[in-house]
Amino acid sequence: MDALNHVNHTVFIRWMETARMHYFVSCGFTTLLEEEGIGPILAGLKVDYHAPVTFPDAMTIQTTMTRIGNSSFDMGYRIASSARGGDTVATATVYGVVFDYKAGKPTPISDELRSKVLELEASET
Protein backbone atom coordinates (compact mmCIF):
# COMPACT_ATOMS: atom_id res chain seq x y z
CA MET A 1 0.00 0.00 0.00
CA ASP A 2 1.17 3.51 -0.65
CA ALA A 3 0.46 6.69 1.29
CA LEU A 4 -2.91 7.08 -0.47
CA ASN A 5 -4.06 3.56 0.52
CA HIS A 6 -3.58 2.22 -3.01
CA VAL A 7 -1.64 -0.86 -3.99
CA ASN A 8 1.76 0.54 -4.99
CA HIS A 9 2.63 0.57 -8.69
CA THR A 10 5.60 -1.74 -8.12
CA VAL A 11 3.25 -4.48 -6.92
CA PHE A 12 1.68 -4.64 -10.39
CA ILE A 13 5.13 -5.34 -11.83
CA ARG A 14 5.67 -8.18 -9.34
CA TRP A 15 2.28 -9.66 -10.26
CA MET A 16 3.29 -9.58 -13.94
CA GLU A 17 6.64 -11.17 -13.12
CA THR A 18 4.89 -14.03 -11.32
CA ALA A 19 2.52 -14.54 -14.26
CA ARG A 20 5.47 -14.41 -16.68
CA MET A 21 7.34 -17.09 -14.72
CA HIS A 22 4.30 -19.39 -14.83
CA TYR A 23 4.09 -18.78 -18.58
CA PHE A 24 7.79 -19.59 -19.03
CA VAL A 25 7.43 -22.82 -17.06
CA SER A 26 4.46 -23.80 -19.25
CA CYS A 27 6.38 -23.35 -22.51
CA GLY A 28 9.67 -24.88 -21.33
CA PHE A 29 11.77 -21.73 -20.97
CA THR A 30 12.90 -22.70 -17.48
CA THR A 31 14.08 -26.13 -18.63
CA LEU A 32 16.07 -24.52 -21.43
CA LEU A 33 17.72 -22.21 -18.91
CA GLU A 34 18.62 -25.08 -16.58
CA GLU A 35 19.94 -27.33 -19.36
CA GLU A 36 21.61 -24.90 -21.77
CA GLY A 37 21.98 -21.59 -19.95
CA ILE A 38 19.59 -19.93 -22.40
CA GLY A 39 16.66 -17.95 -21.09
CA PRO A 40 14.67 -14.76 -21.19
CA ILE A 41 15.93 -11.39 -20.04
CA LEU A 42 13.82 -8.27 -19.64
CA ALA A 43 14.70 -5.46 -22.06
CA GLY A 44 11.86 -3.06 -21.37
CA LEU A 45 8.51 -2.56 -19.70
CA LYS A 46 5.55 -0.26 -20.33
CA VAL A 47 2.63 -0.17 -17.88
CA ASP A 48 -0.60 1.79 -18.21
CA TYR A 49 -2.56 2.12 -14.98
CA HIS A 50 -6.30 2.51 -15.61
CA ALA A 51 -7.72 2.52 -12.07
CA PRO A 52 -6.43 2.35 -8.50
CA VAL A 53 -6.50 -0.91 -6.57
CA THR A 54 -7.19 -0.91 -2.85
CA PHE A 55 -6.98 -3.67 -0.27
CA PRO A 56 -8.66 -6.12 -0.10
CA ASP A 57 -9.03 -7.25 -3.71
CA ALA A 58 -8.21 -10.24 -5.90
CA MET A 59 -6.50 -9.77 -9.24
CA THR A 60 -6.60 -11.82 -12.42
CA ILE A 61 -3.53 -11.47 -14.63
CA GLN A 62 -3.81 -12.50 -18.28
CA THR A 63 -0.53 -13.02 -20.11
CA THR A 64 0.01 -13.55 -23.81
CA MET A 65 2.94 -13.58 -26.21
CA THR A 66 2.10 -10.80 -28.66
CA ARG A 67 5.21 -10.97 -30.85
CA ILE A 68 8.01 -13.46 -31.44
CA GLY A 69 11.01 -12.14 -33.35
CA ASN A 70 14.37 -13.70 -34.15
CA SER A 71 15.76 -13.35 -30.63
CA SER A 72 13.24 -11.01 -29.03
CA PHE A 73 9.62 -11.18 -27.96
CA ASP A 74 6.84 -9.03 -26.55
CA MET A 75 4.33 -10.10 -23.92
CA GLY A 76 1.04 -8.39 -23.20
CA TYR A 77 -0.68 -8.25 -19.83
CA ARG A 78 -4.15 -7.40 -18.60
CA ILE A 79 -4.73 -7.06 -14.87
CA ALA A 80 -8.36 -7.22 -13.77
CA SER A 81 -9.89 -6.44 -10.38
CA SER A 82 -12.50 -8.64 -8.71
CA ALA A 83 -13.64 -5.72 -6.55
CA ARG A 84 -14.28 -3.75 -9.75
CA GLY A 85 -16.31 -6.56 -11.34
CA GLY A 86 -13.47 -7.82 -13.52
CA ASP A 87 -12.67 -4.40 -14.96
CA THR A 88 -9.17 -3.82 -16.28
CA VAL A 89 -7.05 -1.86 -13.82
CA ALA A 90 -3.76 -2.07 -15.75
CA THR A 91 -2.36 -3.18 -19.09
CA ALA A 92 1.29 -3.67 -19.90
CA THR A 93 3.83 -4.80 -22.44
CA VAL A 94 7.11 -6.46 -21.58
CA TYR A 95 9.90 -6.48 -24.16
CA GLY A 96 12.18 -9.47 -23.75
CA VAL A 97 15.22 -11.05 -25.34
CA VAL A 98 16.29 -14.68 -25.40
CA PHE A 99 19.74 -14.58 -23.87
CA ASP A 100 22.65 -17.01 -23.83
CA TYR A 101 23.93 -16.48 -20.30
CA LYS A 102 27.13 -18.46 -20.97
CA ALA A 103 28.08 -16.39 -24.03
CA GLY A 104 26.67 -13.18 -22.58
CA LYS A 105 24.66 -12.22 -25.66
CA PRO A 106 21.25 -12.59 -27.30
CA THR A 107 20.58 -15.83 -29.15
CA PRO A 108 17.96 -16.83 -31.72
CA ILE A 109 14.71 -18.35 -30.48
CA SER A 110 14.83 -22.04 -31.34
CA ASP A 111 12.15 -23.59 -33.55
CA GLU A 112 11.27 -25.90 -30.65
CA LEU A 113 10.68 -23.03 -28.22
CA ARG A 114 8.77 -21.06 -30.86
CA SER A 115 6.52 -24.09 -31.45
CA LYS A 116 5.89 -24.53 -27.71
CA VAL A 117 4.93 -20.87 -27.35
CA LEU A 118 2.57 -21.05 -30.34
CA GLU A 119 1.07 -24.26 -28.95
CA LEU A 120 0.55 -22.64 -25.55
CA GLU A 121 -1.04 -19.57 -27.14
CA ALA A 122 -3.38 -21.77 -29.21
CA SER A 123 -4.48 -23.68 -26.11
CA GLU A 124 -5.33 -20.45 -24.27
CA THR A 125 -7.74 -19.10 -26.88
Predicted ranges, named:
Residues 1-44, 100-125:
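Hot-dog-fold acyl-thioester-processing enzymes
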Residues 53-55, 66-125:
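HotDog/MaoC-like acyl-thioester-processing domains
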